[in-house]
């Protein structure tokens, strides 16, 4: 009488588990990078959208429009080039370039997550002229995440108000983000 046994040996089972583990690890890495790419793209798109709104609002109102980094919707973060927590945009009715109760806020973007955004050195706010013209000098926003310099991108606004996405210069550093 022939006794056929069906099944796997312990060695075969362990080999299959090891292969599944390796494949899962590779898939997770790609998935994680895709999620970080999407978050960085979203932050860059929201920033570009606010720049466009500011130009339109300043032209429509005939007043200066200001965009500044902000932790909440109530005030600019004075002297900061860190836009990672978000920003506000408003029509500056009294010309002091700070958000006051009399000013008309038209955008508030709150960011969470692993994207770190910094503006060019010394650029703590963006002020659009009453005719909708941009501030008059180049401005670069650098967007970094937990992957560091290798995956950083920039949003560059030229003197004409046109913006483009690119890779940061070689000397640009990204903070360590956990």
Where are these regions (language model features)?
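Glycine-centered recognition micro-motifs in short, flexible terminal segments and loops
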Residues: 1-24
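N-terminal helix-rich module
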Residues: 2-3, 22, 26-60, 64-178
């Amino acid at each position: 009488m022939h006794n056929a046994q069906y099944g796997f040996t312990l060695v075969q089972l362990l080999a299959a588990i090891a292969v599944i583990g390796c494949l899962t690890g590779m898939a997770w890495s790609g998935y994680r990078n895709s999620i970080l790419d999407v978050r960085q793209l979203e932050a860059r798109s929201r920033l570009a959208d606010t720049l466009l709104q500011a130009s339109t609002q300043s032209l429509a109102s005939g007043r200066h429009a200001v965009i500044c980094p902000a932790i909440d919707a109530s005030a600019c973060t004075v002297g900061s080039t860190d836009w990672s927590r978000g920003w506000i945009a408003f029509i500056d009715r009294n010309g002091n370039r700070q958000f006051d109760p009399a000013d008309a806020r038209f955008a508030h973007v709150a960011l969470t997550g692993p994207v770190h955004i910094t503006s060019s050195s010394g650029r703590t706010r963006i002020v659009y002229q009453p005719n909708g013209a941009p501030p008059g000098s180049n401005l670069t926003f650098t967007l970094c995440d937990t992957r560091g310099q290798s995956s950083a991108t920039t949003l560059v606004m030229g003197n004409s108000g046109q913006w483009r996405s690119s890779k940061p210069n070689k000397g640009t550093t990204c903070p360590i983000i956990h």
